[in-house]
Amino acid sequence: MDSVTKKTRQDGSEVTERQGGSSSGLKTSSHTGGSGVEKRSYTHSSGYVTSSGSGRLNSSSSGYRQTQSPSSTLTKSPGSTFERKTYVNRHATYEGSSSANSSPEFPRKEFASASTRGRSQSRESEIRVRLQSASPSGRWTELDDVKRLLKGSRSASCSPTRSSSSTLPIPKKAVVETKMVTESSQSVSGTYDTTILNTTLPPYTWSSTLPAGSSLGGYHNSMGQSSSLINAMSHSTGSVFGVPNNLAPSSHALNTGLSTSSTVFGVQNNLSPSSSALNASAASAAYGMKNTSQTNTMNSTGVSASAGGTILSSQGDDFLHKDCKFLLLEKENAPAKKEMELLVMTKDSGKVFSASSTGLNGGSFAEDTLKKEKQGLSSYAADTGLKSDANGGLKSAPTRDKATYAEIQNGGAGGAIGSAPSWCPCGSCCSWWKWLLGLLLAWLLLLGLLFGLIALAEEVRKLKSRVDNLEKINHSFLTVNQGNPYLEKDVSKVDFLHGVAPSSTFPFENEESVWLMVKSRLNKEIERGYFRGERGEPGMKGDMGLQGPKGDRGLPGVPGIPGPVGHQGPEGPKGQKGSMGDPGMEGPMGQRGREGLPGPRGEPGPPGFGEKGDRGAAGPPGPPGPPGSAGLKGPMGSPGPQGPPGPPGLQGFRGEAGLPGAKGEKGATGPPGPKGDQGEKGARGMTGEQGSRGIPGPPGEPGAKGPAGQAGRDGQPGERGEPGLMGMPGARGPPGPSGDTGEPGLTGPQGPPGLPGNPGRPGAKGEPGAPGKVISAEGSSTIALPGPPGPPGPIGPTGPPGVPGPVGPAGLPGQQGPRGEKGSAGEVVIETIKTEVSSLASQMLSDLQGRAGPPGPPGPPGESVQGLPGPRGPPGLPGPSGPPGRPGSSVSTSETFVSGPPGPPGPPGPKGDQGEPGPRGFTGEPGEPGLPGFSSHGGTVTMQGPPGPPGPPGPKGDAGVPGAPGIPGTSRGGSRQIQGPPGPPGPPGPPGPGGSSSQEIQQYVADYLKSDNVRHYLTGVQGPPGPPGPPGILTTADGKNFDFAELATRVMSYVTSSSDHYQSFASSVSTTSVLYQELLNMLQREEIRQYLVGPRGPPGPPGPGVDGMSLSLDYDELTRRFISYLTSSGMSIGLPGPPGPPGTPGISYSELTAYLRNSEFSGLVGPPGPAGPPGPPGIPGSSGISLEDISAYLQSVGYSSISGIQGPPGPPGPPGPPGFSGTGLLSYADITHSDEFRSELIQYLKSDEVRSYISGPPGPPGPRGPPGPKGDSGLVAGSMSSLYHDSLASERLHGGSIGAEGSHGGSLGASSSYGSSMSSSMSSYSASMGSDGSYGASVGSDGSFDGLLTAEESHRRSAGPGRSYSSSFTGSLDYNELARHVSENLQSRGILQDLMSYTGQGPPGPPGPPGPPGISRVFAAYGNVTEDLMDFFRTHGTVRGPPGEKGERGYPGPKGDPGPMGPPGRHGQRGPKGEKGEKGEQMYSGRRRRRSVGV
């Protein structure tokens, strides 16, 4: 700004004005007290306004000293709103201008703006004249001309516009503009301004245009608060451009101004922001703003009308438009002028509006600008006068008088007319003030009246209430009189008179006394009635209402200015309108009048008396009304629906996200994603027998993963190759910690599958030991399943079974008999079981108690201990592991839970330690699941006949890696072949808690699994104990022999009678009798009996187990528990019974292998043997197994494509009578609401225990897997990675979608282990499953992990490239191929048939030995399956690294669904596989369920 600084007083506020082109200085005047006019002249040059403008103004950053005048409105009024000040506008230029128009004093400076001054002045005068003349018309055209003139002087142009509100202001503005101290300044200013404006207020570029108000205001404001100039006014911003500034405060832009009259000027008025309406007018944009404001305040109407409408629109657009131009143009006077004109136009309206303003003329307050100019005019009347100082002279003219305008026009000369100095607060302030005062007084008066009225009303109400009360009293008497009692009384009286005994109805003993009393009361009432009438008078109290005094105040309230107000004013303190006082009086009178009303009321009262009484009588009825409230209850109903059902359906997916949450719901589990993993396991479930293998628990390390194992997938494959299942579980095994899961022991039921015993071959595998760590999802993250597994050492024999897990389906495989040794495998169980068993086992144990148990005996796991292979755990994949035939281990029911006898051992649970089973790693070969054959499939269950033969599926190889299937272990869903034990489950009771209640059992199982002893079993099936012996005969607590027939009957009846769960089961079963028979046969089967009978003997604890069973073997209870367990496990019906050793799945492949080898399930493990310790097959082993584990396992096994996940289900081996396992259980499972199963499975998976397995750490992977839709074709497609990805993608999507999949899909990372493994398996499964995507789906379709792979894979294969599996079935396991085999196997068993997904899948046929499930190095290494799997995948590429991220894309995964087309999978029937099928079935159940959901 120029160095020159001036201080002037405007409105009593001191304005410091700096002149000079420099923008730095602002002149602000604060208006005092809000003269409304800011007077601020921010003169600083426009510069001030410029950028600094905003700052300055407000802060008065540079010289701008803006005091806010009291008038808060403007506070800065932004410089008087218009002050134009244009600050920007050159206010600097105008030296006085600062406010340029805003303050009259400045105005003169403004007028005298430097070079333009002369021109400005004349222009100003001209403008004023025009404005005034135009004002009426409201046409701003003239203003436009004026603006042009003003524009000539830049400031003029802008300012004027700004002034718009008051005509004067515009000129002022011009003056101000002129004021620009020099042309140069001006120019500079202009430029500067422009820039500044643009900068500051870019919105309106006006620099000068800004009408000061606007701009100014804006600037002002800007300075003030907004950054825009407007800011100061901020509201004022409203200034026109304030709009831009919008002054933030206010709402409309202009309006916003503080109402501030919008615009700066309005600002002044601003005070009255009230005019908010005006605001708009204020909007009027600077011009008139001031006026507007005032007007506004007063009226706002006027303003509104003209200013608001015109100005706003013109101003808004034009101003902005023009203003910008102005800024630009200002330098160019001519164009600028044009713009100015526009502004002027606006101004005119402002003027009009000003006129509108009430008393004030637009000029006076309305035009603050004018006003300021007028300020010279001291009185409001003077308001009309405007001051303008063209050359520093002020002109003041009454706004109203055109003459004044003319004056202004002419001379602008000096002195303001009516010259209260513009700075004189009275100029605008007084008026403004008076208005405020008047308004306040009026308000007070009104408030007084209001309060008076309120008081009056209150009084009346009180009187009324009193009257009512009296009436009520009277009525009560009257009523009584008239009412029954009295009437009766009368009657009585009459009777009495007649000699009739008084009626007893009347309460009073002495009727007469009553009557008298009534009478007296009535009399009193009458009296009261009169009183009541008197009371009515009290109504008079209304007088209080007078509050006359307030009324007086109110009068003052009327703004003195307005004549009326004035009157009141006098009356009020404002002596002025003393006369008005009379009116004030009237006001009170009015009140009295009202009071009078009450009086009348009084009169009516008396009459009312009688009537009222009657009415009173009527009143009573009212009461009834209340009852209505009851309705409320309705809402409660809603809870009923409670989602329970829902969860199941979506559950799978939903669970995903909710993983944990979902868990609660099983359905919610929706995330099944994790479940998905389990699902895999599920498939494994079939492998359940394999479960025994699980004992290898050592692999447990993967435990965590194990759960992930998802054996679910395997499960299907389980059919394929029970071993596979086991393997996976193996992985789970690692979770050793899982061991704690002890509960899973429950899986025991799976036990029956244990039969596979033959597998023994894996024996070697035992080594995994280390992993013992199996983490059990169960509570402890890592259960060191390892623990005992060691002992299982003997695993040797079982060895092969190793992984069979998956074989699950093979379940029946013949009696692995030898498998008993597998005992060790139990460990695996822990993982899976742990997780699954925990829940399943508890139930199952309680129900089946030991269901898995029997498998327990897996025979001395001996070898199974297999060292802790822990790491091996993952092997779980063993997946294919031939038909574990012996679901024995069936721990499988649980996902992981290797079916290992552990289940029943459950209690043996103490073994809890699954810990080590890890080593079980090798599921050995699940070999012949043999047992599984039994599949409870429901009617289909053909008992599978002991697939026995399948047993040796031969190397089936643990491929079992499928481990994942683990879950399937028990076929929790029921779909799953329940894998293993399920069948036996029933009686397993003896094992351990057996007798206990489900929860107890669950506890036992958990404890057992967790305990070292059990862990051994679970892990290694430890079972060295070999079949506990109890197996032989189950004895009930009462000492009776266990009657299998009874058990079968009960189970059947329970199943059939139990809710829908089983209905479907029943339906699926051709006939209940068939199922029953099958079940009975299964139960009686040696393998199964072992399960049922006791915990697999080996379980050591079994003894206790036996006790448990012996506690009291209530067949009904047992059955119930068994089923409940299965159901809770997600198996629809555990019935399937043996189905499947597959159970594994909880165990890592190694565990399974070891377990199976050691257990009677060795056969089950069977072929898996080759799978060798599929090693960590990773996931499959148990849900615990992570994808990576699975991946590793798979790779080791050769399923590179599926990367461990599936773990090679291991060729189901010749599951032997597939019929039994796969179909029966599967069917049954299918029947049993796959959804339910899925939900349960999901829930289970979601449960913390399981989740730890499954999810394990979500696994870093976050599977990138989703990589792409690939899932669709990729599905299993060639590589695990693709599969995995696909699955991840789809799954993730799917599940992920699900969220899916919850942890699984979504996190893949989270789910990662489980998710991952699930993912891959799921992926395939998912693909096939499609939406199901989640574990459940995978399980749903395959049931076991394997199954999953199987169906899925097969599906995939068929759908997508069949790719490796089929090609290299013998060689590396191609999951696709494997899936196909498994699917075929399952189908052959009839298992898949139920699955929607694979309708046609031919039985996967033995998956073919998956080849050693390949231990998941990772899995085995740690319990963290997820991590392992992820690592594995990453390492091998199977998992695309964390594809997880990508995973999202996975949605394509759903494409996978098409996979189901897989039917082709039918492949020749792997008939034998069926055994595995058992396992598979269990898994199936779960998986399938999922699948169906998915589907």
UniProtKB/Swiss-Prot annotation:
It is found in: Cell junction, Hemidesmosome; Membrane. Residues 1296-1308 have a biased composition (Gly residues). InterPro entries: Collagen (IPR008160), Collagen_superfamily (IPR050149). Residues 1486-1495 have a biased composition (Basic residues). It comes from the Eukaryota. The intracellular/endo domain is disulfide-linked. Prolines at the third position of the tripeptide repeating unit (G-X-Y) are hydroxylated in some or all of the chains. The keyword Cell wall biogenesis/degradation does not apply. Its main location: other. Residues 1-435 are cytoplasmic. Residues 51-63, 702-711, 761-773, 809-818, 1309-1336 have a biased composition (Low complexity). One of its GO terms (molecular function) is extracellular matrix structural constituent conferring tensile strength. One of its GO terms (cellular component) is extracellular space. This is Collagen alpha-1(XVII) chain. It comes from Gallus gallus. The lineage of its organism: Eukaryota, Metazoa, Chordata, Craniata, Vertebrata. The gene is COL17A1.
